């Protein structure tokens, strides 16, 4: 069982889209998946067909403020093998509310570890959708994760932002989670008609080498439409270019297991 945070400090890079479609792809391969929506915007929540207007106690906020345990807030989605812990805007207040707790960075790890130890075999993967900033919530996710998946938009300044993110990850490894690894970098919003996309791809592959997945996710209007219908694009339109790319990426992600094993 692996806990993987999907992270980028920049918004609008396809982070949540990657979470919900990787989760859907893995679930269709009979993998049991738990998505944790750790973004106060709640986009992973609505993108999987649930409401981000639920009572705050019944969301990840309830777990992190101590009013609920993990097992009490897990919700079934409409998709087989795919569960979620939802989020809503109240989560944005957690950093202020826990200001006096010196161990607050470890709250999620403590709660999640306790649950998974009691229910071994419940899930093959836990995927955490991080907020697009280096906030307390992001630190919580990094502390409890085995590895990180980084969506990288193939646009100007993308690599500069990625370099900053890598520095942040190194600081977390030194102080809070020495076993944290980069599982891979996924190129998103790729436009083959645009020279900039191919340039960013080349620079990313030259610098990060095997960490960059072979699969690239194209710009595709269906990827933008699907969340408004409360479903992953893999289900909303299986034949569109975005779906085909995420199916391919899911296969590549699974095939990593033979090379990285449980240490990922």
PLM-predicted stretches and their roles:
Residues 1-264:
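P-loop NTP-binding core
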């Amino acid at each position: 069982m692996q806990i993987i945070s999907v992270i980028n400090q920049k918004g609008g890079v396809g982070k949540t889209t990657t979470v919900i479609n990787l989760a859907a792809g893995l679930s269709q391969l009979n993998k049991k998946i738990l998505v944790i929506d750790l973004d106060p915007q709640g986009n992973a929540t609505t993108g999987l067909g649930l409401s981000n207007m639920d009572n705050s106690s019944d969301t990840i906020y309830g777990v992190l403020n101590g009013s609920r345990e993990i097992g009490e807030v897990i919700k079934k989605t409409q998709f087989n093998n795919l569960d979620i812990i939802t989020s809503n805007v109240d989560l944005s207040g957690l950093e202020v509310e826990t200001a006096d707790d010196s161990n607050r960075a470890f709250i999620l790890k403590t709660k999640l570890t306790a649950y998974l130890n009691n229910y071994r075999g419940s899930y093959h993967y836990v995927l955490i959708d991080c907020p697009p900033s280096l906030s307390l919530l992001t630190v919580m996710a990094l502390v409890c994760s085995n590895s990180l998946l980084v969506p990288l938009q193939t646009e100007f300044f993308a690599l500069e932002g990625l370099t900053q993110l890598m520095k942040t990850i190194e600081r977390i490894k030194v102080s809070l989670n020495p076993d944290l690894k980069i599982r891979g970098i996924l190129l998103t919003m790729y436009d083959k008609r645009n020279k900039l996309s191919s340039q960013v791809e080349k620079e990313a592959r030259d610098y990060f080498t095997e960490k960059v997945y072979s699969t690239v996710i194209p710009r595709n209007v269906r990827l933008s439409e699907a969340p408004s219908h409360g479903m992953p694009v893999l289900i909303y339109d299986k034949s569109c270019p975005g779906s085909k790319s995420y199916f391919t990426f899911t296969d590549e992600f699974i095939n990593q297991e033979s090379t990285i094993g449980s240490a990922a």
